[in-house]
């Protein structure tokens, strides 16, 4: 799928903490300076992301049923709740999505 102007990307509330953690790891491993990490977060905040409120019980059930961690289940649950495609390059997550009838972009499980 191609990003289209004005498209809103739905994310679970954990998304921003995962982004911040990935940037922290990059700084800690001296891959990027802290100023770049802060700038990168600022750039992402300018995108049209919408947090989708999730039910923790639904996430746990999805995690147990699909044998994925609760963090990954949150992304699956957003797609299930909204009928949206799941954008991931994680093969295992894409396969779990396919089992739930979720369209996955850009990775399509074989």
Question: Predicted segments — roles?
Answer:
Residues 1, 32-43, 91-98:
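Short alpha-helical "patches" and their helix-cap loops
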Residues 12, 76-110:
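Acidic, PIN/NYN-like endoribonuclease modules and their adjacent C-terminal/linker elements
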Residues 8, 50, 103-105:
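Conserved beta-strand segments of alpha/beta enzyme cores
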Residues 20-48, 54-59:
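Active-site-proximal, substrate-binding regions of enzyme catalytic domains
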Residues 1-14, 26-35, 100:
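Short, well-structured N-terminal submotif of metal-dependent ribonuclease cores
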């Amino acid at each position: 799928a191609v990003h289209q102007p004005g498209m809103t990307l739905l994310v679970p509330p954990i998304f921003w903490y995962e982004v911040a953690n990935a940037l922290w790891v990059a700084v800690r491993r001296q891959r990027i300076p802290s100023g770049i990490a802060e700038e990168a977060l600022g750039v992402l905040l300018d995108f049209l992301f919408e947090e989708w409120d999730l039910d923790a019980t639904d996430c746990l059930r999805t995690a147990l049923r699909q044998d994925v961690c609760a963090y990954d289940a949150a992304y699956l649950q957003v797609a299930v709740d909204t009928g949206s495609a799941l954008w991931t390059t994680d093969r295992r997550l894409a396969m779990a999505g396919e089992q739930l009838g979720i369209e996955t972009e850009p990775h399509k499980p074989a």
